[in-house]
């Protein structure tokens, strides 16, 4: 099967592939347009770590930084970052705009994240998300909000306001259920006010491979103790994702979701994130091949994207094995491993990692402002 056929075959099954990457040369070279035209790429995601690598790790932004500071010498480091990021993502959104229109607003999105320092402040998250969405000024822009308790609160407000939202750093089915509920409440508020539903789109970014990265060493300890855990290695991340998808399907069949769909709402799709394989013993497309299903997105880093184009498999895999997934999670508890505490830890670590990348990036921009880079 050709690369084009793989991506388009996934679309026929109801899944869209997005690109978990942004850098200015992706736009300048025409490569992004080529990926959309030739491969069928459906969207793009960014985060502070991706922008840290793009801006701090290359010289591609040197001229843009100089020009921005000449135009507005009063820019602080964070304002300078958002100016650079918005420039990139507006251009990317424009490249995706024909796809957005062709799909009736269902696909062709780009995502910009609020400051990770706001992860536990709902009001500040709402203010910044509204401001960034207005500055992006593109119908196919999404604002990324972390899936913390504060982020869930912000989500409901933002959806009701008409802001497209990508809820990120989701690790547990319980937190995802809260996110889906908040999305429904936000959409119901719009419906009650007689406002359009089809113009507001959201995804819920559920992180996958990091779950196995934490659990596999714990399972190895149990194996060394002679306990039955070998069958769970490399399985729990996919099981966790399958249970999230099962919850989505249950809710989609319910009266509230049906009412929203009838009024024009696009479903809040699950977006599989952190799908690059970190364990070299596993297939490099494990978290792509195993998570294919209708009304989902998978955002792939470049290496995983290329691997899937080369040798990925295309078949519906998400809806199967739900009872097996439940049994695997139950077996984990029998081994004395608390999945909820693991996912809570992963949420905290994810926020800290983005904060660290953000601080590093702002430090680099501070040096640039002082003429040190």
Curated annotation (Swiss-Prot):
Starting at the broadest rank, the lineage of the source organism is: Bacteria, Pseudomonadati, Pseudomonadota, Gammaproteobacteria, Chromatiales
Which reactions does this protein catalyse? D-sedoheptulose 7-phosphate + D-glyceraldehyde 3-phosphate = D-erythrose 4-phosphate + beta-D-fructose 6-phosphate
UniProt cross-references to InterPro entries, sorted A to Z? Aldolase_TIM (IPR013785), TAL/FSA (IPR001585), Transaldolase_2 (IPR004732), Transaldolase_AS (IPR018225)
Location in the cell: Cytoplasm
Please describe what this protein does.
Answer: Transaldolase is important for the balance of metabolites in the pentose-phosphate pathway.
**Pfam families per record:** TAL_FSA (PF00923)
Q: MF terms per GO, please?
A: transaldolase activity
Task: Write down any Gene Ontology CC term.
Answer: cytoplasm
Q: Which UniProt keywords apply?
A: Cytoplasm, Pentose shunt, Schiff base, Transferase
Its primary localisation, in coarse terms, equals: cytoplasm
Cite the annotated pathway: Carbohydrate degradation; pentose phosphate pathway; D-glyceraldehyde 3-phosphate and beta-D-fructose 6-phosphate from D-ribose 5-phosphate and D-xylulose 5-phosphate (non-oxidative stage): step 2/3
Out of the domains of life, which is the source?
A: Bacteria
Q: Which residues form the active site?
A: 144
* UniProt GO BP: carbohydrate metabolic process; pentose-phosphate shunt
What is the name of this protein? Transaldolase
């Amino acid at each position: 099967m050709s690369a084009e056929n793989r991506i388009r075959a996934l679309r026929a099954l109801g899944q869209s592939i997005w690109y978990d990457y942004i850098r200015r040369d992706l736009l300048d070279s025409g490569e992004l347009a080529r990926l959309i035209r030739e491969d069928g790429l459906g969207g793009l995601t960014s985060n502070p770590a991706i922008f840290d690598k793009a801006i701090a790790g290359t010289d591609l932004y040197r001229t843009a930084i100089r020009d921005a500071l000449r135009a507005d010498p009063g820019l602080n480091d964070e304002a300078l970052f958002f100016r650079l990021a918005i420039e990139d993502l507006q251009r990317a959104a424009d490249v995706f705009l024909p796809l957005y229109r062709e799909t009736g607003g269902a696909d062709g999105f780009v995502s910009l994240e609020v400051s990770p320092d706001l992860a536990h402040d709902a009001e500040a998250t709402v203010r910044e998300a509204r401001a960034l969405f207005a500055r992006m000024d593109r119908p196919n822009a999404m604002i990324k909000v972390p899936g913390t308790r504060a982020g869930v609160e912000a989500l409901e407000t933002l959806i009701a306001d008409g802001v497209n939202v990508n809820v990120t750093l989701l690790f547990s089915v319980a937190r995802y259920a809260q996110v889906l509920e908040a999305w429904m409440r936000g959409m119901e508020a719009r419906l009650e006010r007689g406002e359009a539903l089809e113009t507001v789109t959201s995804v819920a970014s559920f992180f996958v491979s990091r779950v196995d990265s934490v659990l596999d060493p714990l399972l190895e300890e149990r194996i060394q103790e002679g306990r039955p855990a070998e069958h769970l290695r490399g399985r729990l991340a996919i099981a966790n994702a399958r249970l999230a998808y099962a919850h989505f399907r249950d809710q989609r069949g319910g009266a509230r979701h049906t009412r929203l769909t009838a009024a024009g709402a696009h479903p809040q799709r699950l977006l599989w994130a952190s799908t690059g394989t970190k364990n070299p013993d596993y297939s490099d497309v494990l978290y792509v091949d195993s998570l294919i299903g209708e009304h989902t997105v998978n955002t792939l880093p470049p290496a995983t994207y290329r691997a899937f184009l080369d040798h990925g498999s295309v078949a519906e895999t998400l809806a199967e094995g739900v009872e097996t997934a439940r049994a695997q999670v139950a077996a984990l508890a029998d081994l004395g491993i608390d999945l909820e505490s693991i996912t809570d830890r992963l949420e905290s670590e994810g926020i800290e990692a983005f904060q660290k990348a953000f601080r590093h990036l702002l430090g680099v921009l501070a040096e640039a402002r002082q003429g040190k880079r």
